[in-house]
């Protein structure tokens, strides 16, 4: 299925709604005459038209141009995208569970509408009628929004921020992964220089945060795989964090322990000793066959052993990640993984839906979305989490997620992941250290934002580190220039 779009300066809205039905279809804005197996969305001077054709069968919908936005109408881009959705829903018989919603933060949308004074009935109509969202997904989003409100009030207090520290090294690359990460064996020579620079950047963040009058709320060390560092390197990094920040005032300090093939008892003890209050051990699946399919070099038993080591080290707040839709997995296999995770009783279980990124080996090797038809049925098994006492506390979506589904963090009551909520709902400044880091400066409750980017690759981050430090001065400058007298208060 090819997607053709004409008559618009950008096909963004149409493309994303079409991809709800055909996630990996090629797109062109300059089409020839429609051929077999194509979707053609067109805006002309007189109206809108969408045609779908597969073989000898075709169907077309037409509509007049919408009223201008200032007269209560909508943009031609959105109107054509909506017409595309209506046609493809009729053509395929598929109703995407999130309807016409393509944004990654549906819960944020609920918060925004409530803040704008919308009634519950108005928000209901917005989701269920205008965007054709399923009642099940909308009710889950509302439940999460209700749970998040007191946490967001704390996190959105003036001049609070969270610190993210990125470790872009992994022992091997998983087949679904498209993140910038370095193979530890190949790039081991970069690790120590990288850690040295990272510690210096953490120190500079403390300086700039103090200049701006910011108060640290939470810390997250992610990756990559942070435990690909040696125990000594973890001590160096986490020691730098402890020396520069008052951890007694931090509400949450997370370290992704990640994979059991590089997480041992010594590293888990270091993480606990240096102040982390929450860790993540990420099995993705408890099937040895599926682990092999995705390139993991460890077994399900290794995950169980790592989890036991973490409990012995004194870790009392543990998250475990699972992924629905991994190659070779089945609904029954995913249910087994979910039941195994629940049996361990971690404080958090996060269920991701596989996302087909073009840089991942799954897509490169042409394992397309049709191989994963059971993913929605897998997510239906999450009722087991609710029955076991977990509740959903944050939700986000990504482009090209299988069947347009979502990622949901589940927690035992009182164990919500604060950093996850803050970064998803964009209420708080996030100061990022490390290669690929994206600092997000937030003011006025999210109404004003600015980003500061680090260099993407570890070798460039190391070689151009002086520029990294220079860019960090933009943190204090943002508050000095944008907040005026408040910046010195």
Predicted regions and their residues:
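Radical SAM enzyme core and accessory elements
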Residues: 1-108, 112-116, 120, 413-489
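A C-terminal junction/extension of Radical SAM enzymes
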Residues: 34-36, 355, 359, 363-433
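Short beta-strand motif preference
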Residues: 50-52, 165, 279-281
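N-terminal [4Fe-4S]-dependent radical SAM core
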Residues: 88-95, 115-163
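Key residue(s) within conserved catalytic/signature motifs
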Residues: 143, 176, 255
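Canonical Radical SAM [4Fe-4S] cluster-binding loop centered on the CxxxCxxC motif
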Residues: 159-195
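Beta-strand scaffold of nucleotide-dependent catalytic cores
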Residues: 166, 280, 348-352, 421, ...
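Conserved non-cysteine loop/helix-boundary elements of the Radical SAM core domain that shape
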Residues: 181-380
């Amino acid at each position: 299925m090819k997607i053709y779009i004409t008559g618009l300066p950008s096909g963004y809205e149409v493309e994303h709604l079409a991809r709800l039905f055909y996630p990996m279809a090629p797109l062109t804005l300059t089409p020839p005459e429609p051929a077999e197996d194509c979707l053609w969305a067109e805006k002309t001077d007189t109206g809108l038209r969408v045609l779908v054709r597969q073989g000898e069968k075709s169907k077309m919908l037409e509509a007049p141009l919408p009223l201008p936005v200032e007269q209560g109408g909508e943009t031609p881009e959105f109107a054509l995208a909506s017409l595309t959705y209506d046609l493809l829903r009729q053509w395929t018989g598929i109703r995407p569970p999130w309807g016409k919603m393509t944004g990654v933060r549906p819960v944020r949308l609920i918060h925004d509408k409530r803040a704008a004074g919308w009634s519950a009935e108005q928000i209901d109509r917005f989701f269920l009628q205008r965007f054709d969202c399923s009642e099940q997904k909308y009710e889950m989003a509302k439940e999460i929004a209700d749970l998040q409100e007191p946490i967001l009030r704390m996190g959105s207090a003036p001049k609070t921020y969270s610190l993210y520290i990125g470790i872009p090294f992994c022992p091997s690359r998983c087949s679904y992964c498209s993140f910038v990460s370095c193979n530890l064996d190949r790039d081991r020579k970069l690790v120590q220089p990288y850690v040295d620079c990272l510690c210096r950047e953490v120190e500079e963040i403390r300086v700039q945060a103090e200049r701006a009058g910011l108060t640290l709320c939470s810390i997250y060390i992610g990756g990559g795989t942070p435990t690909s560092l040696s125990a000594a390197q973890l001590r160096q990094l986490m020691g730098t964090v402890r020396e520069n920040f008052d951890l007694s005032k931090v509400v949450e300090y997370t370290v992704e322990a990640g994979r059991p093939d590089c997480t041992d008892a010594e590293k888990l003890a270091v993480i606990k000793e240096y102040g982390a209050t929450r860790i993540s051990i990420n099995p993705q699946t408890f099937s040895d066959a599926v682990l092999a399919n995705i390139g993991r070099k460890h077994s399900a038993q290794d995950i169980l052993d790592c989890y036991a080591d973490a409990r012995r080290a004194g870790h009392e707040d543990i998250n475990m990640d699972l992924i629905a839709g991994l190659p070779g997995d089945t609904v029954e296999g995913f249910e087994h993984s979910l039941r195994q995770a629940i049996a361990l009783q971690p404080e958090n279980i996060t269920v991701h839906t596989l996302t087909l990124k073009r840089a991942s080996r799954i897509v490169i090797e042409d394992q397309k979305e049709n191989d994963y038809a059971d993913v929605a049925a897998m997510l239906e098994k999450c009722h087991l989490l609710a029955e076991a006492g977990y509740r959903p506390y944050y939700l986000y979506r990504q482009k090209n997620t299988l069947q347009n589904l979502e990622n949901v963090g589940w927690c035992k009551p009182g164990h919500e992941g604060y950093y996850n909520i803050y970064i998803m709902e964009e209420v708080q400044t996030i100061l990022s250290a490390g290669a690929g880091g994206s600092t997000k400066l937030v003011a006025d409750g999210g109404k004003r934002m600015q980003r500061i980017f680090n260099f993407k690759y570890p070798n460039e981050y190391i070689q151009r580190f002086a520029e990294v430090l220079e860019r960090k001065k933009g943190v204090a400058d943002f508050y000095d220039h944008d907040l005026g007298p408040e910046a010195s208060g």
